[in-house]
């Protein structure tokens, strides 16, 4: 669908991992993290930059959450600052999902590290935010 940014393309359609199909909004564009153990459905596309932006990504993870939150920290690709972060408790279902509303202070390609299972699992994803 779109080349996305960094190493993370944006897809629409195609074959989804089985763990990411439970009540999935498969009609939406999505990103797949590296390694392929997390993916996010983009309810807001394109993602908007700005601290008051209304964004929504529904993350699916391939491994049990174990009751632990999803934690994410990001920065513009190729820079160490500014930073942005979000977290979501493991309180949604069905399936291994985390609905989030990430915000970033400026437009561009942002690299996030997603962490869950109390740090046992992690994946990288690049997300394009537009002004």
Regions found by a protein language model. Name each.
Residues 1-105, 109-131:
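Contiguous segments within soluble domain cores/interaction surfaces
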